[in-house]
Swiss-Prot record:
HAMAP family per the UniProt record, alphabetical: Ribosomal_uL3_B
Quaternary state and interactors: Part of the 50S ribosomal subunit. Forms a cluster with proteins L14 and L19.
Any one GO molecular function term: structural constituent of ribosome
Protein name: Large ribosomal subunit protein uL3
Protein family membership: Belongs to the universal ribosomal protein uL3 family.
UniProt keywords, alphabetically: Ribonucleoprotein, Ribosomal protein, RNA-binding, rRNA-binding
InterPro entries per the UniProt record, alphabetical: Ribosomal_uL3, Ribosomal_uL3_bac/org-type, Ribosomal_uL3_CS, Transl_B-barrel_sf
NCBIfam families named in the record: L3_bact
Species the sequence originates in: Corynebacterium aurimucosum (strain ATCC 700975 / DSM 44827 / CIP 107346 / CN-1) (Corynebacterium nigricans)
Function: One of the primary rRNA binding proteins, it binds directly near the 3'-end of the 23S rRNA, where it nucleates assembly of the 50S subunit.
Length: 218
């Protein structure tokens, strides 16, 4: 496996804490229980049109797995897992079906991209959803302090443009935060300490991959 090869793993966001770096400065970190995952399928350009590995994470009661999924896991020779995801890469020769993928694959990697599902906030107003300043608190403003205000013209254009930022469902979106620094790797406990915040609530599923922008290595 080359140094610049894309690597990825599934994990669970445990929460945030803080640690000290080499210069005794406090660094806020997010703790991710990364893996262990298992390779359940290998996709190749010849048969599938692209190269990728399929990894599975999290134990699941075999009685709650449908027959197609049961057969898929049985073919791979692994017990049923709760989550399955694909990690695309140029070369899959370093992997084989049934192989375990642990957090130590990120040894030597400095920066990662983390994908997760953001917290759902339900129906939210424009001030909360988009950070609008709102309207004046006095001077004739009548029960419109948190309203959007004007959303377009009258006879022209005679409609509201697509993408106009207004009130609506907020959160519960799949979001990727890029170029986050790996502060520490605890291989024994399968823990990954990532500097800063990552998307999602505690206990949520996240995908951690080597950074695609700016270089994964310092």
């Amino acid at each position: 496996m080359s140094e610049n090869e894309i690597k990825g793993i599934l994990g669970t966001k445990l929460g945030m804490t803080q640690v000290f770096d080499e210069e005794n400065r406090v660094v806020p970190v997010t703790v991710v229980e990364a893996g262990p995952c298992v390779v359940t399928q290998i996709r190749t350009k010849e048969t599938d049109g692209y190269n990728a590995i399929q990894i599975a994470f999290g134990e699941k009661d075999p009685r709650k797995v449908n027959k197609p999924a049961t057969g898929h896991f049985k073919k791979a020779g692994v017990t049923p897992r709760r989550y399955v995801a694909e990690i695309r890469m140029d070369d899959t020769s370093a992997y084989e079906v049934g192989q375990e993928v642990k957090v130590d694959i990120f040894e030597g990697v400095s920066f990662v991209d983390v994908t997760g599902t953001t917290k759902g906030h339900g129906y939210a107003g424009a001030m909360k959803r988009h950070g609008f300043a709102g309207q004046g608190a006095a001077h004739g403003n009548q029960a419109a302090h948190r309203r959007v205000g004007g959303i377009g013209g009258a006879s022209f254009p005679g409609r509201v443009f697509k993408g106009k930022r207004m009130a609506g469902r907020m959160g519960q979106d799949r979001v990727t935060t890029q170029n986050l620094k790996i502060q520490k790797i605890d291989a024994e406990s399968n823990l990954l300490l990532i500097k800063g915040a990552i998307p999602g609530a505690r206990g949520g599923l996240v995908t951690v991959k080597t950074a695609v922008k700016g270089g994964a290595h310092a």
